[in-house]
Amino acid sequence: ERATARMKDPGDGGADGQQLSQHRWKGARSIGLAHQLNQQFIELCCEPSLDGASGHPFPVVASYRDLWSELDPRARQRLSLFPFVIVDLRFGDVAWWRMVATNGTHARSHVNGAAPTARWDWLALETLMFGWQVAREDRSVASMIFAMPPSVADCIAALTTRQVRTLAIESAKSLRLRWDNHPRLWRELL
């Protein structure tokens, strides 16, 4: 009888399969935001006005311009469903973030090319705000969602909201597609 009661208890994630485990991953609620950010980034990358001739800021996107432009809305959504963020704002660059933490928010980008529109500035702001929020809540989740080393998460978590806004706009040119140094991966995904 005791075993039967346990199996019917919906609060323990038991044998009835109706409830999720009580031990959910801390970052589970961030996945939806990662999908939204990915979707915005993919939409910007697919814009026909951004071609190789106009100096697209992402070489891997310019290289496969035809594949990106052929993505229909459903394919774009599927591509956005990675359980992590595919937008990178130098989250793996420990030295750069330490410099920002030491010198304030006036760290200029070292990326060639110009950000094509203010929409990229907004994407940079949303990316950094999301990274900042996650880094403040849980460094291990920041590591998984953004591939952010703990020392970078510490630097980002210590920023003020004003610093986040300023840094995002100043660093919009540093936005890049995650794994952009692996064009074959992106060709296969597209």
Residue ranges of each PLM-predicted region?
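Surface-exposed beta-loop interaction hotspot
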Residues: 114-120
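Long, compositionally biased
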Residues: 79, 85-86, 169-190
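Exposed alpha-helical structural elements
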Residues: 74, 141, 163, 184-185
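Structure-specific DNA junction-binding interface
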Residues: 1, 6-109
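Residues that form generic nucleotide/phosphate-binding pockets
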Residues: 44, 134, 167, 188-189
